[in-house]
Amino acid sequence: MSHFEILSLEGLRNDGRRWDEMRNFQCRIGIEPSENGSAFIELGNTKVLCIVDGPSEPVIKSKARADRTFVNVEINIASFSTIDVKKRFKSDRRIQLQCLALQNTFEEIIQTELYPRSQISVYLHVLQDDGAVMASCINATTLALIDAGIPVKDFVCCSTAGIVESDMLLDLNSLEESALSWLTVAVLGNIKKVVYMQLETSMHLDYLESVMNMAIAGSEHIYNTMQSAVRQSAKPALASLS
């Protein structure tokens, strides 16, 4: 795919955005009242639902840890989530690696020492995939954990960025992901510390830092929206206490 199919002479992308524009980001918390925690993320056409269960007794006893909780992550990708056959049938190995990355990331963020010999289960349902799925899974997990009342050290906020020739792009859609070098970056909302980064395909070292900084800037935008959603969801509870 040529440069001009990704970014026109007028500086517009195939979905009408400029290089530094994000897609519309919306999030809802507590949409499944019967669950311990839940959150729904929409980033453009990408849609992810997260359900959190626990802390509870570990399903597999051997995974119980004497000094902290064990975080189990499962990702389910709906068969109708994308029209791209290659993406629809992505390998189980890739999904397992994504689950492991999410587990490692959130075991560092959750105050796991408060729940020894227990398990927190995170179930992610990718309902529609139009790019930035891993980022959306991370953002949805953060909100669902907060909704479940599980203590976390900070928000984990995530976004993507890529490069076409020497032009950087923020928040790639599915078409852009299939054609460009890009990365996913997650940071702690308050201190902007990078806690997760995944590079997809090769990228020239001269551009890596700039692309990473763009993804971090996108994560800051995500953080502000997520903070507002949490405050909004907490209003009824706070009102009942007054």
Swiss-Prot record:
Pfam families associated with the record: RNase_PH, RNase_PH_C
InterPro entries recorded: ExoRNase_PH_dom1, ExoRNase_PH_dom2, ExoRNase_PH_dom2_sf, PNPase/RNase_PH_dom_sf, Ribosomal_Su5_D2-typ_SF, RNase_PH
Protein function: Non-catalytic component of the RNA exosome complex which has 3'->5' exoribonuclease activity and participates in a multitude of cellular RNA processing and degradation events. In the nucleus, the RNA exosome complex is involved in proper maturation of stable RNA species such as rRNA, snRNA and snoRNA, in the elimination of RNA processing by-products and non-coding 'pervasive' transcripts, such as antisense RNA species and cryptic unstable transcripts (CUTs), and of mRNAs with processing defects, thereby limiting or excluding their export to the cytoplasm.
GO biological processes: exonucleolytic trimming to generate mature 3'-end of 5.8S rRNA from tricistronic rRNA transcript (SSU-rRNA, 5.8S rRNA, LSU-rRNA); nonfunctional rRNA decay; nuclear mRNA surveillance; nuclear mRNA surveillance of mRNA 3'-end processing; nuclear polyadenylation-dependent mRNA catabolic process; nuclear polyadenylation-dependent rRNA catabolic process; nuclear RNA surveillance; nuclear-transcribed mRNA catabolic process, 3'-5' exonucleolytic nonsense-mediated decay
Residue intervals passing through the bilayer: none
Keyword check for Cytoplasm: yes
Subcellular locations according to the entry: Cytoplasm; Nucleus, Nucleolus
Protein family (similarity comment): Belongs to the RNase PH family.
Cellular component, GO, one term: nucleus
Subunit structure: Component of the RNA exosome complex. Specifically part of the catalytically inactive RNA exosome core complex (Exo-9) which may associate with the catalytic subunits rrp6 and dis3 in cytoplasmic- and nuclear-specific RNA exosome complex forms. Exo-9 is formed by a hexameric base ring of RNase PH domain-containing subunits and a cap ring consisting of csl4, rrp4 and rrp40.
Entry keyword set: Cytoplasm, Exosome, Nucleus, RNA-binding, rRNA processing
Superkingdom: Eukaryota
GO terms for MF: RNA binding
Species for this entry: Schizosaccharomyces pombe (strain 972 / ATCC 24843)
Protein name: Exosome complex component ski6
